[in-house]
UniProtKB/Swiss-Prot annotation:
Keyword Metal-binding included in the entry's annotation: yes
Catalysed reactions listed for this entry: AMP + ATP = 2 ADP
GO terms under cellular component: cytoplasm
The protein, known as: Adenylate kinase
Residues where ATP binds: 10-15, 126, 135-136, 195
Record text on subunit structure and interactions: Monomer.
Positions that bind AMP: 36, 57-59, 83-86, 90, 157, 169
Disulphides: none
Purpose of the protein: Catalyzes the reversible transfer of the terminal phosphate group between ATP and AMP. Plays an important role in cellular energy homeostasis and in adenine nucleotide metabolism.
Annotated spans, NMP: 30-59
Length: 213
């Protein structure tokens, strides 16, 4: 099975993806993680991507699609795509790549729907472990080490540090989502991401189970 999960910034894509791959034994392809790894390499490409991300702009489709294509070449079997596609052009690209590689397409699409004000509050309060990608709330997590992997490398993500960039990312998401909904309308599962992590996971599991019967 091939599942993709998308939603606005702060909707919990990474958190829910981690829970899903643990439960269903999927492999994970996270576009966000791929980009952050390149940024941390401090290569010429990484510096260019960092500047784009800090300004709240989206990475060019050709860069994203090339990264994804390289990653998919390493994966067999069931997998989950976190944060891709982000627009209709990327959706068409994904269909073409999957059909060419394995004569398949995406089976299920999970859309996490989140109110803008909640998204902004979450992003302003988000703290990320750079090593295991665990996410914490700055206002409630007072430790200096990650509870999961004990790393001390806890930081705000560069794309969460600027309110103008946050608002721009949210606006950009809304400008693209209708095209994706229409493209995947027969495979789309809509989830209320305003709820707690556990409640969101329960809703996703329930809807996935119905589609597996």
């Amino acid at each position: 099975m091939i599942i993709t999960i998308f939603g606005p910034p702060g909707s919990g894509k990474g958190t829910q993806s981690s829970l899903l791959i643990a439960k269903y034994n999927f492999k994970l392809v996270s576009v966000g993680d791929l980009l952050r790894n390149i940024i941390s390499s401090e290569s010429k490409l990484g510096k260019g991507i960092k500047d784009t991300v800090e300004s709240g702009n989206l990475i060019q489709d050709e860069v994203i699609c090339k990264l994804l294509c390289d990653q998919l070449a390493l994966i067999d079997g069931d997998f989950l795509l976190d944060g891709f596609p982000r627009n209709l052009n990327q959706a068409h690209f994904l269909t073409q790549v999957l059909q060419k590689r394995c004569n398949r397409d995406v089976d299920l699409v999970i859309e996490l729907q989140l109110d803008d004000n909640i998204a902004i509050d979450r992003l302003k309060d988000r703290l990320t472990c750079l090593d295991c990608k665990s996410i914490y709330s700055i206002s409630s997590f007072k430790n200096t080490t990650c509870a999961k992997c004990k790393s001390t490398r806890l930081e705000k993500r560069i794309d969460d540090a600027n309110m103008l960039a946050i608002n721009k990312r949210i606006r950009e998401y809304h400008s693209q989502i209708e095209g994706l909904r229409e493209y995947y309308k027969d495979k789309l599962l809509t989830i209320n991401a305003n709820l707690s992590v556990d409640r969101v996971m329960q809703e996703i599991e329930s809807k996935i189970s119905c589609n597996l019967i």
